[in-house]
Amino acid sequence: MAKKSKIAKERKREELVNKYYELRKELKAKGDYEALRKLPRDSSPTRLTRRCKVTGRPRGVLRKFEMSRIAFREHAHKGQIPGVKKSSW
């Protein structure tokens, strides 16, 4: 489990990205890079890290399920993810 402070910080970043999305888009279209530079750093979408929705783990996250590989494996074995089953050949 990730630290709660890290998860909260990431959530705050997501809110900032959403808040400044339209303004950032307009400034990029105009080419006003000076105004872009004055926006908060955390409003840039490149600063976001994909995190597991279950554990908050930042690494090894499967995009489709928004879960870390470890949490995905546990939930899949329990049959809690619809349409996913262990394959064998």
UniProtKB/Swiss-Prot annotation:
It comes from the Bacteria. The keyword Ribonucleoprotein applies. Pfam families: Ribosomal_S14 (PF00253). InterPro entries: Ribosomal_uS14, Ribosomal_uS14_bac/plastid, Ribosomal_uS14_CS, Ribosomal_uS14_sf. One of its GO terms (molecular function) is structural constituent of ribosome. One of its GO terms (cellular component) is small ribosomal subunit. One of its GO terms (biological process) is translation. PROSITE patterns: RIBOSOMAL_S14 (PS00527). Keywords: Ribonucleoprotein, Ribosomal protein, RNA-binding, rRNA-binding. The keyword Hydrolase does not apply. PANTHER family: 30S RIBOSOMAL PROTEIN S14 (PTHR19836), SMALL RIBOSOMAL SUBUNIT PROTEIN US14M (PTHR19836:SF19). Part of the 30S ribosomal subunit. Contacts proteins S3 and S10. Belongs to the universal ribosomal protein uS14 family. Binds 16S rRNA, required for the assembly of 30S particles and may also be responsible for determining the conformation of the 16S rRNA at the A site. This is Small ribosomal subunit protein uS14A. The lineage of its organism: Bacteria, Bacillati, Bacillota, Bacilli, Bacillales.
